[in-house]
Amino acid sequence: MQESIQMLILLDLKKKIEKSNADFMHISVEGPLGVTGRHYCLEHEIPYTTCIHTKFPEYVYERFGIGLDVTKGLLKWFHNSAAKTLVNTESHKAELEDDGFTDLVLWSRGFDEKIFYPCPEGGKQKYLLYVGRVAVEKNIEEFLKMPSELPKIVVGGGPSLKSYARKYPDVDFVGFKKGKELADYYRDAACFVFPSLTDTFGIVLIEALACGTPIAGFNVTGPKDIVIEGVNGSLDDKNLRDAVNRALQVDRATTFDSSKTYTWDTVAEQFINSLVPMK
């Protein structure tokens, strides 16, 4: 039954590819659809590109205990047959190259400057903020349990939301927000705290910068590609609270200025330049 379904997917995808008369093939997911697209391209000797958005092996290990080598091996099988694989940051690119991934190119991220911008009046800046998925793999508990004189607000949902809300009643969990309402949370925060150890970029980081809010986090892939010590935030190898205390001293004007390199025009240019013609 499963083989029959896979065959139908492959045949349907083949028809769509042939009818599209496309110039380029980019496969953005590693799941069943991505594997099907990869199979078609290899069978027909069509060059294609892929991308890696997250540290998926680390996520799988944190949640299910599956060894890193197993998942990394599967990802290398999927991506190393591509002409190019797009990655978010230089540090993640270096890590992947050390793990045996090949033909990696940089593909950054941007933000909507019509929504994310500093508060003209300077803002309230009275709390510490986390925005993102409320889940164990985000290491959010490092933020929740951290001693702080400032209140803490968590924006976002996820599988650990209810349990963390019960465990940390002093933290204000406000749920999922978007658009101007989300931007207002950024603007009114004294510091944006990003405790994750497994993100490859973190769009929330540049959204915070665009609102003039300095970042505190750990010195790991993702944050260390974006945060400039004393300019737009602070990172620490072990102590999140120390990073927060330093970030609170950072000028919000220089923080905002550092966001200006993250434009969607640059992102689009990087993507277009990475594509490989199918014919």
Predicted regions and their residues:
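Aromatic "clamp/platform" in nucleotide-sugar-dependent glycosyltransferases that forms part
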Residues: 197
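A charged, aromatic-enriched C-terminal amphipathic alpha-helix characteristic of glycosyltransferases
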Residues: 238, 249-277
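Donor nucleotide-sugar binding/catalytic pocket of nucleotide-sugar-dependent glycosyltransferases
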Residues: 72-118
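Nucleotide-activated donor-binding/catalytic signature segment of Leloir-type glycosyltransferases, i.e.
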Residues: 162-180
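Short alpha-helical donor nucleotide-sugar binding micro-motif in glycosyltransferases
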Residues: 17, 177, 184-189, 271
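Conserved donor-binding/catalytic core segment of Leloir-type glycosyltransferases
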Residues: 120-155
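Acidic anion/phosphate-binding donor-loop and adjacent secondary structure
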Residues: 111-126, 162-163
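Short hydrophobic beta-strand element within catalytic cores of glycosyltransferases
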Residues: 214-217
